[in-house]
Curated annotation (Swiss-Prot):
One of its GO terms (cellular component) is cytosol. Binds 1 [2Fe-2S] cluster per subunit. This cluster acts as a Lewis acid cofactor. It comes from the Bacteria. InterPro entries: Dihydro-acid_dehy_C, DihydroxyA_deHydtase, DiOHA_6PGluconate_deHydtase_CS, ILV_EDD_C, ILV_EDD_N, IlvD/EDD_N. Mg(2+) binds at D81, D123, K124, E491. Functions in the biosynthesis of branched-chain amino acids. Catalyzes the dehydration of (2R,3R)-2,3-dihydroxy-3-methylpentanoate (2,3-dihydroxy-3-methylvalerate) into 2-oxo-3-methylpentanoate (2-oxo-3-methylvalerate) and of (2R)-2,3-dihydroxy-3-methylbutanoate (2,3-dihydroxyisovalerate) into 2-oxo-3-methylbutanoate (2-oxoisovalerate), the penultimate precursor to L-isoleucine and L-valine, respectively. It comes from Escherichia coli O81 (strain ED1a). Its cofactor is [2Fe-2S] cluster; Mg(2+). The lineage of its organism: Bacteria, Pseudomonadati, Pseudomonadota, Gammaproteobacteria, Enterobacterales. Homodimer. NCBIfam families: ilvD, PRK12448.1. This is Dihydroxy-acid dehydratase. Keywords: 2Fe-2S, Amino-acid biosynthesis, Branched-chain amino acid biosynthesis, Iron, Iron-sulfur, Lyase, Magnesium, Metal-binding. HAMAP family: IlvD.
Length: 616
């Protein structure tokens, strides 16, 4: 039977110094036999998705201590991708994922904590904490800060829903007046919480439900709603139960690697495809699987993408629905219920509540549950009041959205598309694959061929788009923006948003070895692997080369002969130490980013660090 990790620092005469320090934090003799549980918070005033988390760690800690544990809180960093977008700050976003994972490992192992409650929310924070949890493999529960309410404003005598992306598009559209742009900006992000669409943050918080590491409702229940408080209270109580199950009963089913099994990873990816989640989730699930030592690859994702339909369509793929609407329709469990009825899920999985998938669906799927309290929870809705306070309102929808024919969540028979919301494409410059969010691609451009316009930085591409140098029919190629080449694999939300601003959203394609924001839609193909900086053939594309994209057949092809590509590769290699680096790009790269780049792998590996370079 395993002993508490914390006993290393709390037991034995030789640990008198450690106990003296523990006493200085408020611990007493009675605490030294209890499990020490880390409350891993991520409060910051920089990020609306985290601005309301300051007091929530204390809320969880109180429940831990009431249940017989000792709670110790610490904080991680948190980068706001939206604020970091469009300038050098975006170089730091993806690398922050590794820093978060490492910082959690450092704190938990340095102090021998027995278990964790992870209070996450936004883009790299949930993935970083997830990676750490699976690396450490001690009992854990995730509880996120929750989604923002959708923005709403009146334009042309009609109330419309808004989010961050609308503010970006209208701000760059020369046809939009200053007053309208200002109105949209002021209305787009009305409350605390992660941005209101199915962007990266909300996608990842939904996936923790499918992985079994968070409670039902975690991905969709609004940050502002009073009902969300119960998730935090439950997490504090439940983590003590899980911890004692493992350490006192030798029950390894309480460990995250046994909950988030390969079957659970497949379910999570199935959910992601069905709900049209962010392409970034592919990157993060691949990275998390490696930490869990699970053989889950792009090949697995490709197989799933060919059989899973799209059952949910949410902003940015449509402005009709946001996360508040997904919640009203039953949230993640509602989508999983439809996938289960379609025979597309692994049923032999459990969650942190100890429930199997069938048990979870029986209790929490609004289509089948008899539990009025559950139905009431899914009626939790927005208040439409600007606030940065968690749990500040208790508004409810009059009815649930249980219409599986025409509602937010659809049944298999009434799917938005028989093809899912994400697809993996392969071709002669994406030998290891690339990713497209098909949920955001107009049917008219699922097949697209056009001449390449090549840029070696996001900045140059933005200048060209706004300067009118990109025209209908072009394929914009942005390279040397991968994990190593950027470094940091910048998100390309500004280029895709500006294409829409210029009226080219359905008339152009964009291909990159970088990545896209969860707010991106359009024919936007990212994660091209291998990346240019690693010798990938995307580095051989020249202006005017024809590129053919065939999403239905999962293909992407540079229409240049093998002989010509071989000649170009030879010329590239002849550049010596300048080979596979961008030409005429001036970019200040800090030592910290260079250190990240030296170990970074391409996107098909999750952009994790190359362990082989460290003898791992």
């Amino acid at each position: 039977m395993p002993k508490y990790r914390s006993a290393t620092t709390t037991h034995g005469r030789n640990m008198a110094g450690a106990r003296a320090l523990w006493r200085a934090t408020g611990m007493t003799d009675a605490d030294f036999g209890k499990p020490i549980i880390a409350v891993v918070n991520s409060f910051t005033q920089f990020v609306p998705g985290h601005v309301h988390l300051r007091d929530l760690g204390k809320l969880v800690a109180e429940q831990i201590e009431a249940a017989g544990g000792v709670a110790k809180e610490f904080n991680t960093i948190a980068v706001d991708d939206g604020i970091a977008m469009g300038h050098g700050g975006m170089l730091y976003s993806l690398p922050s994922r590794e820093l978060i994972a490492d910082s959690v490992e450092y704190m938990v192992n340095a102090h021998c904590a027995d278990a964790m409650v992870c209070i996450s929310n936004c883009d790299k924070i949930t993935p970083g904490m997830l990676m750490a949890s699976l690396r450490l493999n001690i009992p854990v529960i995730f509880v996120s800060g929750g989604p923002m309410e959708a923005g709403k404003t009146k334009l042309s005598d009609q109330i419309i829903k808004l989010d961050l992306v609308d503010a970006m598009i209208q701000g760059a559209d020369p046809k939009v007046s200053d007053s309208q742009s200002d109105q949209v900006e002021r209305s787009a992000c009305p409350t605390c919480g992660s941005c209101s669409g199915m962007f990266t943050a909300n996608s990842m918080n939904c996936l923790t439900e499918a992985l079994g590491l968070s409670q039902p409702g975690n991905g969709s229940l609004l940050a502002t709603h009073a009902d969300r408080k119960q998730l935090f209270l439950n997490a504090g109580k439940r983590i003590v139960e899980l911890t004692k199950r493992y350490y006192e009963q030798d029950d390894e089913s309480a460990l995250p690697r046994n909950i988030a099994s390969k079957a659970a990873f497949e379910n999570a990816m199935t959910l992601d495809i069905a709900m049209g989640g962010s392409t970034n989730t592919v990157l993060h699930l691949l990275a998390a699987a490696q930490e869990a030592e699970i053989d889950f690859t792009m090949s697995d994702i490709d197989k799933l993408s060919r059989k899973v339909p799209q059952l949910c369509k949410v902003a940015p793929s449509t402005q009709k629905y946001h996360m508040e609407d997904v919640h009203r329709a039953g949230g993640v469990i509602g989508i999983l219920g439809e996938l289960d009825r379609a025979g597309l899920l692994n049923r032999d999985v459990k969650n942190v509540l100890g429930l199997t998938l069938p048990q979870t669906l029986e209790q929490y799927d609004i289509i089948v549950t008899q539990d009025d309290a559950v139905k009431n929870m899914f009626r939790a809705g927005p208040a439409g009041i600007r606030t940065t306070q968690a749990f500040s309102q208790d508004c409810r929808w009059d009815t649930l959205d249980d219409d599986r024919s025409n509602g937010c969540i659809r049944s298999l028979e009434h799917a938005y598309s028989k093809d899912g919301g994400l697809a993996v494409l392969y071709g002669n410059f994406a030998e290891n694959g690339c990713i497209v969010k098909t949920a955001g691609v107009d049917d008219s451009i699922l097949k697209f061929t056009g001449p390449a316009k090549v840029y070696e930085s996001q900045d140059d591409a933005v200048e060209a788009i706004l300067g009118g140098k990109v025209v209908a029919g072009d394929v914009v190629v942005i390279r040397y923006e991968g994990p190593k080449g950027g470094p940091g694999m910048q998100e390309m939300l500004y280029p895709t948003s500006f294409l829409k601003s210029m009226g080219l959203g359905k008339a152009c394609a964009l291909i990159t070895d970088g990545r896209f924001s969860g707010g991106t839609s359009g024919l936007s193909i990212g994660h091209v692997s291998p990346e240019a900086a690693s010798g990938g053939s995307i580095g051989l594309i020249e202006d005017g080369d024809l590129i053919a994209i065939d999403i239905p057949n999962r293909g992407i092809q540079l229409q240049v002969s093998d002989a010509e590509l071989a000649a170009r590769r030879e010329a590239q290699e002849a550049r010596g130490n300048k080979a596979w680096t961008p030409k005429n790009r001036e970019r200040q790269v800090s030592f910290a980013l260079r250190a990240y780049a030296s170990l970074a792998t391409s996107a098909d590996k999750g952009a994790v660090r190359d362990k082989s370079k460290l003898g791992g």
